[in-house]
Curated annotation (Swiss-Prot):
Coiled coil: none annotated. According to the redox status, the Cys-129-Cys-167 disulfide bridge may have a role in regulating protein function by affecting its ability to bind capped mRNA. Keywords: Cytoplasm, Disulfide bond, Host-virus interaction, Initiation factor, Nucleus, Plant defense, Protein biosynthesis, RNA-binding, Translation regulation. Residues 39-48 have a biased composition (Low complexity). It comes from Arachis hypogaea. Residues 1-55 are annotated as: Disordered. This is Eukaryotic translation initiation factor 4E-1.
Length: 231
């Protein structure tokens, strides 16, 4: 499980994993939020009064980003359709947002949903990401919801020994599969990347082999880029 063993964060495991009642299960496919999400905001959907009065701060603030498949075809430059949705800084804000957004299985094919540390953009060109890379896991279509949640909890709960290396994560929804990628900032630090990859597999109880690709190689070779680390 994601947050059972490590005690790095000052927030307890129960506080991270305590999920208030899910408030919305009726979003239309392809939508992220149940109300108008046309503008980015740092204010999440309202938390319950009791939780809001006693917030549990996270070590880092995080921002959800969405790349709408319907907008991609209208954009000339790669990445220009990615937009921030919400920024959260407490456990309560995270659950308030998570319970009001679609999970990967309900997103339209072609959608990309990101969660990155605040002020880091989910792009190769971002200075923090430029020298990094990513681990990637693959799932059958509609089967990544739980692994996506556990990935988020592992990141925001600071459960990785090399958490400072982590930039964020993205889930890509495609016709036949879904992919979750964990982005890191210093690809050349093999020890840190291997540690992150191993812990991620443990958190998700993922048994297949995963590979790590440098962003620089991905930019040069696209899909022909080869894994530098494999576990």
């Amino acid at each position: 499980m994601v947050v059972e063993d490590t005690q790095k964060s000052s927030i307890t495991d129960d506080q991270i994993t305590a999920n208030p009642n899910n408030e919305n299960e009726d979003l239309e496919e392809g939508e992220i939020l149940d109300d108008d999400d046309s503008s980015a905001t740092s204010r999440p959907p309202s938390s319950s009064g009791a939780l809001a009065r006693n917030p549990h701060p996270l070590e880092n603030s995080w921002t959800f980003w969405f790349d709408n498949p319907s907008a991609k075809s209208k954009q000339a430059a790669w990445g220009s359709s990615i937009r921030p949705i919400y920024t959260f800084a407490t456990v309560e804000e995270f659950w308030s947002i998570y319970n009001n957004i679609h999970h990967p299985s309900k997103l339209a094919v072609g959608a990309d949903f990101h969660c990155f540390k605040h002020k880091i953009e989910p792009k190769w060109e971002d200075p923090i990401c430029a020298n990094g890379g990513k681990w990637t896991m693959t799932f059958p279509r509609g089967k990544s919801d739980t692994s996506w949640l556990y990935t988020l909890l592992g990141m925001i709960g600071e459960q990785f020994d090399h958490g400072d290396e982590i930039c964020g994560a993205v889930v890509n929804v495609r016709n036949r599969q879904e992919k979750i990628a964990l982005w890191t900032k210093n690809a050349a630090n093999e020890a840190a990347q291997v540690s992150i990859g191993k812990q991620w597999k443990e958190f998700l109880d993922y048994n297949d082999t995963i590979g790590f690709i440098f962003h620089e190689d991905a930019k040069k070779h696209d899909r022909a880029a080869k894994n530098k680390y494999v576990i």
